A protein has these predicted regions:
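Iron-sulfur cluster-binding electron-transfer modules in prokaryotic oxidoreductases
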Residues: 1-159
Length: 159
């Protein structure tokens, strides 16, 4: 999405980059159009689902709240953790270059993601996110399955 901005002064690529930027979409931006077609076609998940909104989505692309709202519209009991706005420690190459700090951030994030519900005392059966770096980083610290939210939707879709 940033190619247009990054290459705006490049005489050869500025127009092409702007075109690519205008076409680029995160898969979550398709959800508003898909919810009506998916409503009523999903099985219920095995249990509550915790959602980790990745930095790439909420800070990089400034896309906040959409995934959560639309998954809830589809009947998925979604839990947002405390400190949802904070990084899980993956941060691209950060987890490789600074594994100690990245591990500390991961443990803090997983602690919040896996908290028991104050209502019924259950823990999430699954964690979903929207960034492969976050997904692999979080999965390395827990036995709870961690996947992309679209994988969850695909699995729940009555085929």
């Amino acid at each position: 999405k940033d190619y247009g901005h990054l290459l705006k002064d490049d005489a050869r690529y500025a127009a092409r980059a702007e075109r690519v930027s205008s076409l680029a979409r995160d898969v979550s931006e398709l959800l508003p159009d898909l919810v009506p077609a998916l409503r009523g076609r999903l099985n219920k998940p095995a249990g509550p689902v915790a959602y980790h909104p990745p930095c790439t989505l909420q800070h990089g692309q400034k896309l906040r709240g959409g995934v959560e709202a639309h998954l809830a519209e589809l009947g998925i009991e979604l839990r947002l953790p405390q400190e949802a706005h904070l990084c899980c420690g993956s941060a691209g190459a950060y987890s490789v270059l600074n594994p100690g700090i990245a591990g500390t951030l991961r443990e803090r994030k997983l602690g919040h993601l896996q908290e028991k519900s104050p209502v019924d005392g259950t823990r999430p059966a699954r964690i979903v996110s929207a960034n492969i770096g976050c997904i692999t980083h979080l999965q390395a610290g827990t036995e709870t399955p961690v996947t992309h939210w679209i994988e969850l939707v695909d699995e729940l879709l009555q085929k």
